């Protein structure tokens, strides 16, 4: 017998024996009612009846309240319990939820338990069938009276009493509380089937704290009978029998017997095995076939169990094969129960069937042999029909009726229950064909079959489950997981597929041939077919499958090349139009732009815009582009390519004769949606990455091409620009594999943009492991083998998308964090090293969104990016210059690796003689950085005007060719945004704040530089003095008495000047506007959540939303969508400026508050651009809050200087002194009203940033 653990105690059942998870809590269930094959439950609360239930996910035995003994004997860290939890965001009433005990603070027990339990609440409530549950990171403190102990059925069943179960057992694991793990499921199966056959109603309830299967009659409903009927199942001489017991619930006449039944050891061994490898006692009609050869997929060290059923009946086998929906969760009683009475060779009472039981220990020692053999002696037990001797005559359940005919409705009801039992009781086993198993997985061993023995020596093989195909179909009984060796072979197979794809697709692209094929798709297809036929002639041994695969690849390529937006003309007409005629186009309102000489259609009518829409007004910050400045030619008279803009003035939407010979003809639909600065940047990208916008003049091997930078203001449409460029670039260079790297917050935006613009290019998004486990996207499907774990699934998903990325022209998108994880060189896993190798060598084009982030010289991410083997790069940034010229140099080198060479050629006079020397790349980069800082940076930083101008000119001459800069009005569209007003509020501190800030400032004056701990404390104290208590370093600078006084100020909003301003502003505008609050730290966000809840009675998740770095990708997307929802209930969004200041759109907000200042001005600029961007319908007001006389003033002056340097680098005109950017005036009516009503003089100075602000 299995030894009991000390924590497994037996307990009587609760008067309400079950509990179900509904409406966010576990509710007590009085009884389960089974009628006509359906199961319903009656709740204790309000007597409500539930009929649409998931019994194996949300139903279990009711948990019992914890006692004083449980604290000492059972409760410990690591076990699962049910706790009473206060969930503020959903309901004010506490609810019962599942949790895990993390730690226990033990205290001496007196009259009651005073111990404190730290528990972590599960996120996935009501899903007890999950193997792994997600837990909330924030622990919850509960007491013993708020804990309930989980319960499960005990292993001992009553066989001769009116009750079936007497006790329940304590359970320490949430997964083990499932009702389908023990012997309760076979009983439930019998009750459901019997209720359909004979219209009997059962109730599973508690009587005298014992579980009873009560049979409900009319007398019970009327209350005229004092006795009740209950059903129980017993075993007599190896025969399973069901019987009815009459009992009086008013008298407890049934006493427990001290004598326990003795059960044969072999049967117990079989019954104790897990349900996935064994069957219940009364369904054990089987025998074990010896193991045989195993392939690499077998689950070491386990073997497949193969059940053999001996039968004397041919028609019985046919009956079983006709039913198509049998599942392993329902066993032999159903087959006995549903036998057809009128069959020619019906079931005979005199004939007996056999259960062949094999000793478990001997089964492991069996050798692999062909055929059927036994290595141990078998014990044979007589087994008669299960339901023949059931003594239920008063209910009409005799043997003849049970073996009677079965109607179609009955089979439908049984099939309905069988599907539910298979779904929730056990993972449904998938069926595969033998050919798929052998070809895909290399399976060599036989598949588990069921051998039905006849009286003769021959045997017949068929499957236990009734298949939809051939009746001889075999079935494999699989384990839950694969072995480590199987995982490795499965991953190796994916990596070999990538290698074969790279070898097949890694060929150089002929630009001229590709362009001619795009211009004349028909001839291109003919040439491709000719090349295909030549290859087939050369290789006489090419299989038919390879030919079909090649034809499919050609069709896929043709479908991609033959875009619906392109004009399709035959070869003869094309040559006639291009060679024999000098076209003179005129507009035909039915056809389009037609040549009046030859009739050639230059532009279809669907691509011609209306006359009133051809000329759109374009607004920029500094000047208008004159028509005379735009050149309509591509090549000058000398045959040298012109570097001027090539968009025609007459109509930007209509391709001219010259445009049909350049890349604009590749994206006619997208071109109409691009704005002027995007069109200039589009040609800029082609010239830097391909050498020209004319395919005939492109030279991919030229030394002049290289990486480039697109530095457009935030919100100017950089993402759409790159998407349009990639759509055209992959048509000319299908073998270039673009890799897009972006911050985690912008991955969702990239994916939506591809869908929004209907780009005909496949996009493969590589998730991080944690994001993949939480996402609903499961692209990998496995047939015939157990489903791998989440980690292996994530690896296979990455490898599968990388293989598709190589197989056809497509885009691979992933986050910087995932890229850095895969690029680790010290990984011990072979697949990690392989993926790192592929990501280094395969990309033909590297796109770095927000590429200014990896700018540090020591950054591991930057070092990994520099190792990517391609010079073709696009770096996107709205704020290119960050902190200093060293980081600026690193950013330019990241975008254009050739920049190192260009700097040395320009600045190092000795480099010309030493360039033949082969030096390491990092040494050359260090040398170039030194010259860049010593010559250019020093000249720009000097106060001498002429020397500064010289340095700026040198920098522009070196970088203007590969940097495209656009400083518009904050909008990337042709629509003019309503306006932007930026105010800097220099605020006075309250008395308590002033005392703390003065002390911290005095301590900082004794240090050289800015210690991080002091900087953090000053930043927090400037918002509210209580926030210093949230840090771990506060005890270093404040004594316990001071901290005690500070603790009392938590909920006093008047003690913080910034807090008072935020509450006043929100109070005045909340009814008509939404507010976006940015903060560098998390502690102020939590404080403001509590203040908003107390002052405005708002709730988190409804009016209050938070966007921080700990949220996963999809959760961030849901928060953004909820805040952007028109007419939604959200009012305030508190966001972390570090995690959420880039790449997202929050145009629902028209008021932006910056609680603290940043060292990097680009962060503030990016944060403002979340609200002030295309789609904004209101004037945006920005409030930068600074505390007077503190470190925040120094940070603000430093960031202003950085903005000025950045303006000088990219502006060709004179940039005025930063002191002239500010003006002491207020044009905001709300702000003016707050200042007028300010009685405590919170504001020292209010300045408006005239340079950054726009009209509004």
Curated annotation (Swiss-Prot):
Subcellular location: Nucleus, Nucleoplasm; Nucleus, Nucleolus
Binding-site residues for ATP, renumbered to this chain: 712-719
Gene Ontology biological process terms in this record: gene silencing by siRNA-directed DNA methylation; positive regulation of post-transcriptional gene silencing by RNA; regulatory ncRNA-mediated gene silencing
Disulphide bond pairs: none
Consequences of knocking out this gene: Decreased, but not completely blocked de novo methylation. Probably due to a partial redundancy with CLSY2.
Signal peptide start-end: none
Protein name: SNF2 domain-containing protein CLASSY 1
Source organism (scientific name): Arabidopsis thaliana (Mouse-ear cress)
